[in-house]
Amino acid sequence: MLLHRMLRTVMVVAVALAAGLVGTVGGGTSTARAEEGKPSQGRQLLFYNHAYGVLDRETADAIEHSAYLREFANFQVRTTTGSGGQTWTGRYLMGRETYLELFGVGDLPGQDGTFGSAGMGVSTERAGDRATVMERLRALGVTEPIEYRQTRDFGDGVPVPWFDAVFTTDQYDSFGAWGMEYRPEYFADPRSKTEPPDYPGDVGRERYLPDDYRDHEMRDVTSVRLAASARDVANTVPMLRAGGFAVRDAGDGAVATRGGVTIRLDAAPRDRAGLKQVTFALNEPAGNRHKERIGRSTLVVGPGLGAVWNFDAPK
């Protein structure tokens, strides 16, 4: 996902809103910090959807051409056209409800294409819950959340509404997170290859993702660990709390848990930022431990129902 492009579009459309938000985000962060020891209120509205990371070129290329990953997961290399004709080509590992999106240095334009850049989407399962998230954000001190609609072009030049996003701020160093809710127009388009709803108002992740995960080992992402600036971490905490995650301090960073996924954000300088680790649940227990070196990363699968993927910084 092109985080910089999304936020730049928002700034062009709503410059006054963005300018007014700079002072309010700090207040929201302070409120979130003060309440981190308390349990989240109400039902969970936002769930881990996906994270992306920009890796060194060696690792990105090794991932793209890995025969093992094509066995391990529902793996795709895909180019997507979004709002305003912006395009991105990513490497995707897709599970039942969650997925991982990986890029190499230079795959994305500008700031987003540098090593260590990363992002994360957390999404609703029921139509209308994004509005409640925005109410909770305002209660946390983010008085003017930034809204954005992403579209998708399936190749005919006609943009189809894809999802509505909300951000706490338009300012970030290397990492940003957004809340999102898939649009009914996207599910209604047969080219999206999505599933019928399981209940009225179903805009969930399982409906959005294909069922091809059943033919592979990987079932879902169970945790992600990313490093980002203290400012980026602080700006993410209100979104997680508004979504219903249980958030606690972890040194200079934060850990959020709920909905079967743990999100760890470590505060770090820019040269140490980026995607650090992802863990997965498997469809069936792996009888033996398998270690796969992929570029400057190491994926360990099994024994049992889990896998761990660690990403090293380039030398």
Regions from the language model: what does each represent?
Residues 1-34:
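Secretory targeting and sorting signals
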Residues 37-63, 186-233, 278:
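N-terminal beta-strand motif that seeds the catalytic metal site of vicinal oxygen chelate
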Residues 37-109, 114-117:
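An N-terminus-focused feature that recognizes amino-terminal "leader" regions
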Residues 48-59, 81, 93, 110-231, 243, 270-295, ...:
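Vicinal oxygen chelate
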Residues 70, 89, 99-169:
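Polyanion-binding and phosphate-handling cores
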